[in-house]
């Protein structure tokens, strides 16, 4: 085995959750408040950050929420949607093989660490991962520092021996 440290994203890599959760969450939140999402909603939200998207939905759909309460409700909606998410084919077998070969693995995700733990536990694969890093703020996945932190915490120092 060439790579000794493995850094996985959860959504879209290990779990089939991109469409169900991340594309479906705004629709589900709007329906919770009796609103009908417009057909162009996904395209409209695509280039917005979380805060800008929240402001847009509150304003355009007249939601009776503050930004703070919006994010609280959105966490609930996302948690409910994650209950339907399944593993992608072959994931369990691959993780077991990597573990048997002595690989150290972690999760680096934009999803809240607590939510990741819940999903990974429900799917029976949490035991494969040493830790979960929330890629937010300074440690965002668009910056290599988050991956260097993960590699270091996995006991690695050589990026060539680490798979992302």
Task: For the regions a language model picked out, list residue spans one by one.
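Active-site neighborhood of HAD-like aspartate-dependent phosphohydrolases
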Residues: 1-43
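Metal-dependent phosphoesterase signature
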Residues: 37, 56-93
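Short helix-capping segments at alpha-helix termini
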Residues: 31-36, 61-65, 124-128, 155-156
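Hydrophobic alpha-helical segments typical of transmembrane helices
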Residues: 24-25, 41, 53, 57, ...
């Amino acid at each position: 085995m060439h790579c000794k440290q493995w850094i996985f994203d959860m959504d879209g890599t290990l779990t089939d959750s991109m469409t169900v959760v991340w594309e479906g969450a705004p629709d589900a939140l709007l329906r919770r408040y009796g609103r009908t999402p417009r057909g162009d909603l996904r395209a409209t939200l695509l280039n917005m950050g979380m805060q800008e998207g929240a402001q847009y939905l509150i304003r355009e759909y007249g939601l009776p929420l503050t930004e703070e309460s919006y994010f609280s409700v959105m966490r609930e909606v996302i948690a409910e949607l994650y209950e339907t998410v399944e593993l992608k084919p072959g994931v369990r077998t691959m993780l077991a093989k990597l573990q048997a070969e002595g690989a150290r693995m972690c999760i680096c995700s934009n999803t809240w660490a607590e939510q990741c733990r819940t999903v990974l536990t429900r799917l029976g694969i949490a035991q494969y991962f040493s830790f979960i890093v929330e890629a937010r703020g300074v440690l965002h996945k668009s910056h290599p520092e988050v991956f260097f932190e993960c590699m270091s915490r996995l006991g690695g120092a050589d990026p060539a021996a680490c798979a992302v």
